[in-house]
Amino acid sequence: TGESFTQLTDFARDLGKTTMMSAQESAEAMSFLGMAGWDTTQIMAGLPNILNLTVASGRDFATVADIVSDNLTAFGMSADESGRYTDALAYAMSNANVNMDTLGESLKYIAPVASSAGFSMEETVSAVMALGDAGIKGSQAGTTLRTVMLNLTGANEKATAKLKELGVEIFDSSGKTRSFNAIIKDLEKALDGMTDAQKTATLNTIVGKTAISGFSTLVNQGADKLNEYTKGIRNSSGATQEMADTMG
């Protein structure tokens, strides 16, 4: 509408004055988000966060906007929550061996599955961080976590039987998926006392040979590391702005 166009034009002009992007670049950014299906209110709520993440990551706006808009949808999050998401990504880049490209590639594979399986965005990003620290990044991290989360939540009969045998509960009494980190913690306890060969065989039964390397890494690093990262993400409000200020 005419009113929306005026709002966005004024907003682009303001961003041109208050950010490193020109009014023209801001307008192009808005057009991109509009094509992604965002309305005027969503664009005005989310754009400043994406602009900051663009500066913080050193990547081009189109790449960052594509990653953020796609992943928000995949995680079932709204544009109003874009700040929470960009802060999570900024925290990840500052604290683990990952960057914008590897994060985007990983989350493309795992975000839809994590959301439908009932695992939180924060725990999912934490798992990607932990894998990145071990040199497992991008699509390899994404496909590994996709297999892990699917098999943990019942996609594979052998995995379900093995988890039951180990006494590892995936769902709580109300049928809701338990915390990913809590499940990893219980797996750690269940594997305690086994030989390395027994641990490998057990984890292989749960996730299969293509995901065993990454899954073993997560379990060996332990839930404490995942919890540390998850806590950091949950307390990361303002991380995007802070990182953009540093990089800018």
Question: Which residues does each predicted region cover?
Answer:
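Carboxylate/His-rich catalytic cores and anion/metal-binding grooves
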Residues: 48-75
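Solvent-exposed, membrane-proximal periplasmic/extracellular interface segments of envelope transport
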Residues: 20-22, 28-43
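Short amphipathic alpha-helical segments that mediate assembly, nucleic-acid/protein binding
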Residues: 5, 24-26, 196-199
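Short extracytoplasmic
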Residues: 1-15
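Amphipathic/coiled-coil alpha-helical interface segments used
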Residues: 1, 16, 72, 79-152, ...
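Gly/Ala-rich hydrophobic membrane-inserting helices
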Residues: 25, 29, 63-65, 141-145, ...
